[in-house]
């Protein structure tokens, strides 16, 4: 109580109210009792070695090392991947080391998980690497880059922009054919959309994402196929000269930037009907053959047979 006779009120958060009589209240400060806490030692005890930490991704039955993102469970080695996915042995030297990388193992692990969960994935397992089966890395002459496979069942078969025989060509492929006929008016018009005849002559028709969930374009971008494809293109650029790159649209142009002193790099808008620039005026097919002629090499027969 102060000299005026009024009760003393303490505003401290630790004050406790105590009633000492019926007539007067006095508030007394109760100082907090500080309890010394014992700090836990950092790290494991001396001489104790712990296993690497692991975690589980949602809905996944496999564990990963948190530092390297490497699957702890055993994975397919590169030879088994070549067998399961029907990859041409001609590509072994270029692909085998890359398929051993942790990110590549993660791609196949997630692919298998999706497949086992019942997801319908396009194209079929045996066609994902179909682009390797028509010519080896040393026979590649032209590179055409797409985005991801057609999401309609029966269309995709492992070659960018191409569809199986008997399937009506999609709009983008129709626009490619329109440009082809504009450049070669005497050519027999294509009667189907299968571009295997191009692939056999060394035209690499490569999507940056190799799989897709049926009916959902872009659904497998997250798997990491793009990194694998970029490494394939990088190694081709490093090991070869005189290739022709047809980069249609911003996506393809961002995927790879070949050295124009070593290769012919051609750019144009994407053949999609949504592009602002009509694809009909694209002269890449003629320009590629003119380039080969100057080098004394045979032209590509762009007929779709």
Curated annotation (Swiss-Prot):
Role this protein plays: Excises uracil residues from the DNA which can arise as a result of misincorporation of dUMP residues by DNA polymerase or deamination of cytosines. Therefore may reduce deleterious uracil incorporation into the viral genome, particularly in terminally differentiated cells which lack DNA repair enzymes.
Compartments, as annotated in UniProt: Host nucleus
Main location: host cell
InterPro entries referenced in this protein's UniProt entry, alphabetically: UDG_fam1 (IPR002043), Ura-DNA_Glyclase_AS (IPR018085), Uracil-DNA_glycosylase-like (IPR005122), Uracil-DNA_glycosylase-like_sf (IPR036895)
Species classification: Viruses, Duplodnaviria, Heunggongvirae, Peploviricota, Herviviricetes
GO molecular function annotation: uracil DNA N-glycosylase activity
UniProt family annotation: Belongs to the uracil-DNA glycosylase (UDG) superfamily. UNG family.
Documented EC number(s): 3.2.2.27
UniProt keyword Protein biosynthesis, yes or no: no
PANTHER family linked: URACIL-DNA GLYCOSYLASE
Protein name in UniProt: Uracil-DNA glycosylase
PROSITE patterns: U_DNA_GLYCOSYLASE
One Gene Ontology biological process: base-excision repair, AP site formation via deaminated base removal
Keywords: DNA damage, DNA repair, Host nucleus, Hydrolase
GO cellular component, as recorded: host cell nucleus
Catalytic reaction(s) noted: Hydrolyzes single-stranded DNA or mismatched double-stranded DNA and polynucleotides, releasing free uracil
UniProt superkingdom: Viruses
Active site: residue positions: 148 (proton acceptor)
Keyword Signal: no
Top enzyme class: hydrolase
């Amino acid at each position: 109580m102060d000299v005026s006779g009024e009760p003393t009120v303490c505003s401290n958060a630790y004050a406790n109210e105590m009633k000492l009589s019926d007539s007067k209240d006095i508030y007394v400060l109760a100082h907090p009792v500080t309890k010394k806490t014992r700090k836990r030692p950092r790290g494991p005890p001396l001489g104790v070695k712990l296993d690497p930490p692991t975690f589980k991704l949602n809905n996944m039955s496999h564990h990963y090392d948190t530092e390297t993102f490497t699957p702890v469970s055993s994975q397919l080695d590169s030879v088994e991947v070549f067998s399961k996915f029907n990859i041409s042995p001609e590509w072994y030297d270029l692909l085998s080391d890359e398929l051993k990388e942790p990110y590549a193992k993660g791609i196949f692990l997630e692919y298998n998980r999706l497949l086992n969960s019942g997801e319908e994935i396009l194209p079929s397992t045996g066609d994902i690497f179909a682009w390797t089966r028509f010519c080896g890395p040393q026979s590649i002459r032209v590179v055409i880059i797409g985005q991801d496979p057609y999401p309609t069942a029966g269309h995709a078969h492992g070659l960018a922009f191409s569809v199986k025989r008997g399937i009506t060509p999609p709009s983008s492929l129709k626009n490619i054919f329109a440009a082809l006929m504009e450049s070669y008016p005497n050519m027999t018009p294509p009667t189907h959309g299968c571009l295997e005849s191009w692939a056999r002559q060394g035209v690499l028709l490569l999507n940056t994402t190799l799989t897709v969930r049926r009916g959902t374009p872009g659904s497998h971008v997250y798997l990491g196929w793009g990194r694998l494809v970029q490494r394939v293109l990088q190694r081709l650029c490093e090991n070869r000269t005189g290739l022709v790159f047809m980069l249609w649209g911003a996506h393809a142009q961002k995927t790879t930037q070949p050295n124009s002193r070593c290769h012919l790099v051609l750019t144009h808008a994407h053949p999609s009907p949504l592009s602002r620039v009509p694809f009909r005026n694209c002269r890449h097919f003629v320009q590629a053959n003119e380039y080969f002629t100057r080098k004394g090499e045979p032209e590509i027969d762009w007929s779709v047979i």
